[in-house]
């Protein structure tokens, strides 16, 4: 594990995942948890059953991780991989909140299908546990934004400055490549933004919902 993404979902993590992949760093992301039942089970065991997580086994096929669920456990992952570098994606808190809640709502729209779909049910329990862990089960706007800001402060206080990049995807390749010690690719920085409807359609396909 070379790069730990500590930025919350909807801060440009999908673009960062694609950028790291293009730099030769296979990158773990919430999409992997949906796509691979073994990863869903691992997070279910950790978050719901409260069993220890084997971080090295979880990330054995990856050189980087961004987005949920891993971003919420950057401390534990950094302890397991102390030589890794940490990237903290930032975004305006108000625009982050609107995007995050829209996405969370899209995921919850799948809930009526969960009782006939055990794999979807397990994945939604993971999503709900992450939401409760990060902002609280019934958090309003102010609590969500406060939790978001508090997380970003903690990361900057706890991670050594020489191991941390505070990053906005609008900055493009230069700061990321300088931080990682690699050459800037001869291609535009990827700017990916999956809307809630696209995410919901993708999840419906993954979980076989028609």
Language-model segment annotations:
Residues 1-4, 61-64, 84-85, 161-165:
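Short active-site oxyanion
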Residues 1-60:
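PAPS-dependent sulfotransferase catalytic core
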Residues 5-7, 66-70, 90-91, 169-170:
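Short His-Asn-centered micro-motif
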Residues 13-14, 71-75, 97, 173-176:
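Short, well-ordered alpha-helical microsegments
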Residues 21, 25-26, 32, 47-59, 75-166, ...:
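PAPS-dependent sulfotransferase catalytic domain
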Residues 32-41, 87-97, 114-115, 150-209:
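The conserved 3'-phosphoadenosine-5'-phosphosulfate
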Residues 45-77, 81:
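Conserved nucleotide-sensing/catalytic segment adjacent to the nucleotide-binding pocket
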């Amino acid at each position: 594990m070379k790069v730990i993404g500590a930025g919350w979902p909807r801060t440009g993590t999908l673009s960062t995942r694609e950028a790291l992949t293009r730099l030769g760093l296979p990158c773990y992301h919430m999409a992997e948890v949906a796509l691979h039942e073994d990863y869903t089970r691992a997070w279910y065991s950790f978050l719901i059953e409260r069993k220890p997580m084997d971080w090295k086994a979880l990330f054995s096929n990856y050189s980087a991780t961004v987005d949920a669920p891993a971003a919420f456990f950057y401390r534990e992952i950094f302890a397991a991989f102390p030589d890794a570098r940490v990237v903290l994606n930032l975004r305006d808190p108000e625009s982050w909140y609107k995007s995050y809640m829209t996405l969370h709502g899209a995921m919850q729209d799948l809930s009526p299908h969960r009782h006939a779909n055990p794999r979807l049910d397990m994945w939604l329990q993971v999503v709900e546990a992450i939401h409760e862990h990060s902002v609280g089960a019934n958090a309003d706007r102010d609590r969500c934004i406060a939790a978001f800001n508090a997380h970003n402060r903690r990361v900057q206080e706890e991670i050594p400055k020489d191991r941390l990049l505070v990053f906005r995807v609008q900055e493009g390749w230069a700061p990321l490549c300088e931080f990682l010690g690699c050459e800037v690719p001869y291609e535009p920085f990827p700017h990916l933004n999956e809307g809630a409807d696209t995410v919901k359609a993708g999840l419906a396909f993954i979980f076989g919902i028609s």
